[in-house]
Regions:
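Non-catalytic structural scaffold of enzyme domains
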Residues: 1-177
Length: 177
């Protein structure tokens, strides 16, 4: 029997990259399983994937950190979000907005200060640890409605509830491979 890997992601679009673009044959053979989660559902998703036959788990950011505390019986692999992934989310969008906020987990490997000279002044960055910090930031953000929020799947809903446009950062297909 082939090895089975379970991916835990935060948005359906991420799931589609894995299932349709990167690993369609492996998904068809049930060698790759994917589960989309909301905040607080990571450990339950891991257990579901393990019951379904996953022999290793892949997650990123806070989900990966949560699983480090609770999963010890199978390999756990971190899917890392990097600078090119964040910059790709900006691609073609800068001109359309009055302000852009990169709302990124502290686990995203993105050095805003190093990129600052390449980005227009209307691009700002907020880094958060616990999800509660991100929620508090978005709740108090004083920005025009024509603001774009770029971040993980957990950022999208609270940003949209405030009336902001929101786009998710995604790992490139090469990064997932």
């Amino acid at each position: 029997m082939a090895y089975c890997i379970g991916f835990i992601v935060t948005e359906e679009a991420e799931s589609e990259i894995i299932t349709q673009e990167v690993f369609p044959a492996e998904v068809a053979r049930r060698e790759v399983l994917v589960q989309t989660v909301r905040p607080g559902e990571t450990e339950e998703a891991a257990q579901n994937l393990l019951r379904a036959g996953a022999q290793a788990l892949v997650a990123r950011g806070g989900n990966f950190r949560d699983l480090q505390k609770s999963v010890s019986d199978v390999p756990l692999v971190e899917l890392v979000m990097r600078t090119p992934d964040v910059l790709q989310a900006l691609n073609g969008r800068v001109e359309d907005y009055d302000q852009i906020w990169l709302v990124l987990s502290k686990f995203v490997r993105f050095d805003f200060d190093s990129c600052r000279a390449l980005l227009p002044a209307k691009v700002h960055c907020f880094r958060y640890g616990p999800v509660e910090e991100m929620l508090a930031f978005l709740a108090s953000l004083d920005a025009p409605l024509n603001t774009l929020i770029i971040g993980s799947g957990f950022v999208l809903e609270p940003a949209r509830l405030r009336g902001f446009h929101a786009v998710q950062t995604r790992n490139s297909p090469d990064g997932v491979r």
